[in-house]
């Protein structure tokens, strides 16, 4: 076995000593503390990666834990992987359930949010004519999945719209409420949209829908480990997320939460025996897969807890405000489509520049300056999504701001 010499854990220990119980918001600006966190990553610093929403680098000690298990598996897969490593998924289940605030028998380990959400989408029995409410800002893959079910089974999928940014939580709840009819069976809501980073009022929508006997599926792909919350704060019965985004777990990890009382009526995506009808592990019946990826979730969770959820989101908001408020202050042509006040957003934000095509600006940022961003071209709005993470340096954020101001002053055709 190779000997790994990751400095990630020692960096976290030094950072924790620096924090010493200090409040999260002032600590967000302590570059010595965050410098220790940044040293836990083996990130490519020849570029500036501001698209951590799709997938994020994992700390080196998490990666090394996964590699260690992959090597061990490869020595004798049928014994090492299936008999030794796979049973350790139960420890991962227990710790994830504790973090989310649910029973461990309600926590299924999946490969990503899409797998979790499609289990919900295809798993509930619906009849021709039954209605599902989504929004035009739901994740495209989920909209495609609902559309396939509509084409195949004759259910009706209704898409509602809300302004960007929305004026209030109550406005969003009312948009859902007004779309409900006697045929409505399901609402799918994103916890935080991948387009603008808007955090939606999940708890209020769940409460409203429950009074009417409507199931609510929550797509939490960008929420878990991005900002603190628990299952009971949402009140939801179903929740799907990826863990390779904000938890910084290995690529190809996620979870699906299904309340115990709902498990019997939600079919798994792949077949499971009738004896597993009320066993959350039926959602993990996916055939042969590496144990290394999901076992390393535990190391990522330990890293997340060492930072702390409040500290993390305070830092992410600080980085967001650093570039967004600067651009707003220095150019009247900049518009930020994400709320910057209160707790309606975390580290994700969307902006555009009047007179500059967002797709061209995104391409220019990469081609000329090696800055990775995400173009958002939606039927109702467009812009560039900026998504830093805890390994992002202040210098990288400032260089991004400098570059956008250069584009505003000189254009993107030079």
Q: What role is predicted for each listed range?
A:
Residues 2-414:
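Pyridoxal 5′-phosphate
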